[in-house]
Amino acid sequence: MYGPTVQRSANGGKTWERSKKIGLPAWSGLTVNATWHIEPGRPQEPATLYLGADPGVLFRSDDAGETWEPNLGILQHPTREHWFPGAGGLCCDSIQLDPRDPYRMYVCIASAGTLRSDDGGQTWLPVNKNVAHDYLPNPYPEIGQCVHKLLLHPARPERLWQQNHFGVYRSDDCGGSWERLDGNGLPGGFGFPIMIDPRPDRPAGGS
């Protein structure tokens, strides 16, 4: 459902109930406009869920989605004043958890780029090296990229793919640097969906 809400079911979808209000602290001056992405927690955390929302915020639930707490590392990120919404808003549209490192996770925000946490979400590092943004004076900024989708290789978590507003990229060093791939036969760089077939390591995207 589009909007600032989450519906959850405890019986396989026969009935649904709304989560308690998904809100932000008054001091932030922000309100939740829409929810964009829900990611389940790790197998050892079956009641944990992560939620990405507009305006570029991340939430965590440890009670199967009944209540949600905002991630302060994202909410108070020192670069936030330089984030700006794309056509769909300032949306946190991808969340990925490293299956080997219990403290490492990634979020993508359009238009802020990809951020990585190595301490369980307390702090976040922009990881956008070599990722272009054609509309900015600096074509390779530290932040500001419009990432539409991020995926992590399930068996090689150091490898990431992203479908960007301006291209398709791959990283082999946990987002430390990126290589652009859409010049290798794709009809265009713009798109939204991307998926991985890990055998034999074959990505597919739409443009």
What kind of region is each of these model predictions?
Residues M1-S207:
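Extracellular glycan-interacting surfaces
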